[in-house]
Amino acid sequence: MLQAKLSSRLPLNALLRIHHGAYAPCVHSLSNRFFNTEGGRTRGGLHSDCSVLRRVIYSQSAFRPSLCKTQHYGTRSFSLSSAAVVNSAPAPVRPYLRLMRLDKPIGTWLLYLPCTWSIALASDPGCLPHLGLLSLFGTGALLMRGAGCTINDMWDKDFDKKVVRTAARPIASGEISRMQALVFLGGQLSLALGILLCLNYYSIALGAASLSLVFTYPLMKRITYWPQFVLGLTFNWGALLGWAAVKGSCDWSVCLPLYFSGVMWTLIYDTIYAHQDKEDDVKVGVKSTALRFQEQTKPWLSGFAVAMMSGLVAAGVNAEQTLPYYAVLCTVGIHLTHQIYTLEISRPEDCWKKFVSNRNLGLLLFLGIVAGNLWKERRDTLLQNEEMFR
């Protein structure tokens, strides 16, 4: 009887989604629909039928992981995670959001953080970083990371089909054609250009110069075992651009060491990332530092970490940074040491965990730069007071 009622009042695809556990909100909406559309029945009878329905649905073990917890008065909890935002978007839009990796924001963070370091270093002593510039660069990082992923997937369509982790990407799976991706790429680059035009002329020219790296990086994995180095040159361009946006030009004594540190950082985290796919990369002919270093990965990463820390010290000295900055650098060094020492390159899940932990490292360094910059005002005040009493 219950089955007949359901089948007569619900679309077939909705019932199939319930059976396979792919449509979490159906528990709430299905019972409400059943309750509200059943005419001429007593409230108690409806309640008992709905209870049976819930017991049937909840008994499906495959469905349990997808359930949304409900609170009193019918209010459901919801998630604001990037993956949840993508999954809740209209179906025609979802492939494009996945193409720009909106469901995996770690890449946007890793592109954005060097920009924040540079903006914070360029701020006046005792001042917080310019919030407007941080917002502009954050939006630009989101768009350019999406554009980079679109270019990468257009180049790598045939490779992605052969790798388990990437076979479901929108272009490789056929959800989006290359022409559709090209149009979408044009839209992203147009919006990013609008962001760039908000900056000064020096920054506009500097930003435009990075486009060659954006387009050529995806090709590097075909011709060299060092594509991560080219990615580092691309991803850390914001270390130059951020300073220029604040000051109107680059102070190379600060910007170059900072940029160098960012490149070393990218070599660390993207080599770790590449170890997830090394077996598939060998099969399809893709090159990476993970394949170049193999069992010598940890010594190489240790060398990159030392180089990164040296560059950060040089940038701090040339930018006249203060005690809080160097205290945080010690913490950054500890983070890198732990990350490399505990890395298990044969376990993809550990590689992913170490890779995403670099967002926290980058945020920590940003906070250290901000704290060091605020401390400059205190230091300058103390120096002025000493001169007054001499």
Region annotations inferred by a language model:
Residues 1-68:
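N-terminal chloroplast transit peptides
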Residues 78-96, 149-176, 270-294, 342-350:
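Cytosolic, membrane-interface loops and tails of multi-pass inner-membrane proteins
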Residues 88-94, 314-390:
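Extended hydrophobic alpha-helices typical of membrane-associated regions
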Residues 97, 108-109, 131-139, 182-186, ...:
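Hydrophobic alpha-helical transmembrane segments
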Residues 97-98, 147, 166-257, 337-344:
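Intramembrane alpha-helical segments
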Residues 108-115, 184-191, 231-240, 298-313, ...:
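Core segments of transmembrane alpha-helices
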Residues 115-116, 120-155, 165, 186-197, ...:
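Membrane-embedded alpha-helical segments that form the functional core of polytopic membrane enzymes
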Residues 136-139, 157-207, 283-325:
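Multi-pass membrane catalytic core of lipid/isoprenoid biosynthesis enzymes
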